[in-house]
Amino acid sequence: HDAGKMMSKKNTFTDFIAAAEHLVKDGWTRPERIVAQGGSAGGLLMGAVANLAPSAFGGVVAEVPFVDALTTILDPSLPLTVIEWEEWGNPLEDAAVYEYMKSYSPYENVSAQEYPRILAITSLNDTRVFFVEPAKWVAKLRATASGNVDVLLKTEMEAGHGGRSGRHED
């Protein structure tokens, strides 16, 4: 875990991409048949690998994805920001952390390239990753990506960070 946090966070992304490339190289599959899936901080991973190696995946499913990490971690008034500095670093006090996070934060790094198909799932009542993060990420992908990319956003209207709770069930 320590080799993939703070100023080593990019190891998480390169390791994930290397695993997908290994499956292809050894003949187990083809890139267009690989669908990557992750939620919350794993959703950040999904956004980062979509930016870094879009041709390595046929699709990406990002559930309650932490894709606007830099903006969120810069706001100490949010419930989890200060305790998350142990994982990500504190970009308010360390310019190197700020620049490092900016270099991988999915929202900041959307570019004019072809992306795999992307499904982002957010929850209206999520108090950890506010629904606006994936919504603005999807909007930026749609506005910026080149080619004919499918980027979908599903908003769970009665769910939180961990999905639907008992009080919302039918």
Predicted regions and their residues:
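Active-site-proximal cap/loop segments of hydrolase catalytic domains
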Residues: 1-170
